[in-house]
């Protein structure tokens, strides 16, 4: 339990509430604090480490300033929010909830259950909430969250440590010594004593301070530590106050008779050595804690000479250390670009680590010879949106878990020891693990999945665009249309022609660095980055006509940066809704194309992307029954497909599962959709908007 240089050098003391002017002129300042000496001088014993809910070996703190994580709002424990690491000291993190100000910063241990990696909330089916006191309109929260996470550095799951187990019994005894967090100044850890024990609670009293700072807590509280904890973790332990008489073993200066039996552990006029790592903050315990001040770093060894103490010197603010925090200039950089980029003082400009991505699963596609179709059906419809490393790991792990022969699929993964996500598999009686390459962009993750799917011979299994819930099969769409009417099935087979009024959703390029190139291609015909696709005529089977235009944006490795056009608007709706208009990506397909030979015309463009036309509600109803409240479940689903193809895929199954017909559609509210249907806030708000628009155009 050796003393660290940083801790010894930081002579940061608390102001003595009972200090008199006479004692301040001759008391001795102590530059360090040793538990062994203190226990011997006071005749006390320290509480055994088994009494605490703390790790026997303190956890390693490898977090960096600026990292993002999920944390529970300390003022609303039911909400999980996005937080940023603002400061680091010992095994603790100073956190700030994104969307709040610096008045509500809080501290957590690296093994606290209140913090978790970004993506955990989504994985468990929960929603990230705005913090209490969110400074903007709550309707802006989804967009704020997206901007905050995009390009930010996410704390790796390996940085989070498991919470230690709870001691079975309360074995604390009155008089035992320990280290405890001052709850009125939570950045301080001070020597304390067990003042009382009642059931599973203990009374914490701070040595040398009045009872104003004492508090009761559970015996398994994470705010109390065994003696010596700060030295082991590199945190700063504040020395006791002045009420405890201590026999000094160091040279004493002359003292007045009034203080012969009492020695102050702090005196501002004594010589103090401040090493280069010292940082300055407030530490008066007389005043209530205010906002955390910005720490300042000293660049040279300073020698503070004795000086006469004035009448108001008792109110002088003392320095308070915060290890591994940031300078004022760095803190300013933490908040630029709406908090999207951060700098670490130790490592310089931070690297943009990752963005977000969402990948959809085609459960009616070709699974190849290596994946079990039954297990594929049990997968979620999509992975994400979330950090690219998390989404990539979950998808690859799902493919390994769905393998007919785990060893074969696992063998397609090439080991990479650069610190990426870990994939595990069990075969040959052993558990094997392999690291994926580290990812820092959505395009890299999508290209990796393209190659992986190509190796598994299931090129159309994954897509960056949603699939149709019942018409994504590349071989026979009729097999998955048992719940559709015969008329709809026949109409779908005639949809190889696209009318000028047919809506084509905007397809996001696989790589965000690609030029804005809009091109048409068939499902099996990739478009290369150079723009040189091979125009050709394809003979499509009768069963594959509908699937060719309803396929998703497959992740095909045949090209470097492939793009595919995904459509989900049927020909019958285009004819029945004359008021529906859209702006196509480029050009139009030749009207002379036969149903069996479709020539795809391509043209490079750099103008603004196209938009999805949202039909007027009054026009939409003409394609169905007169009154939307009489719509069937299938008509509601068809309405959503035409209104917003981007969210219609996941909604189709939900609407069928919950039997959402026209009447139920009008009764849907955002909170109901989020709570009972599991929708995220963004899709729920979109759906509410469409419902309101539909109500406005409702027939009287």
Swiss-Prot record:
Statement: the UniProt record of this protein carries the keyword Repressor: yes
InterPro entries for the chain: Mbt, PcG_chromatin_remod_factors, SAM, SAM/pointed_sf, SAM_Scm-like, SCML2_RBR, SLED, SLED_sf
Keywords: Isopeptide bond, Nucleus, Phosphoprotein, Repeat, Repressor, Transcription, Transcription regulation, Ubl conjugation
Protein's GO biological process: anatomical structure morphogenesis; negative regulation of DNA-templated transcription
Pfam families for this protein: MBT (PF02820), RBR (PF17208), SAM_1 (PF00536), SLED (PF12140)
Biased composition (Polar residues): 19-28, 253-281, 575-584
Main location: nucleus
CDD domains xref list: MBT_SCML2_rpt2 (cd20109), SAM_Scm (cd09578)
PTM annotation (Phosphoserine): residues: 256, 261, 267, 299-300, 499, 511, 522, 570, 583, 590, 594
One cellular-component annotation, GO: PcG protein complex
Single GO molecular function: histone binding
Job description of the protein: Putative Polycomb group (PcG) protein. PcG proteins act by forming multiprotein complexes, which are required to maintain the transcriptionally repressive state of homeotic genes throughout development.
Protein name per UniProt: Sex comb on midleg-like protein 2
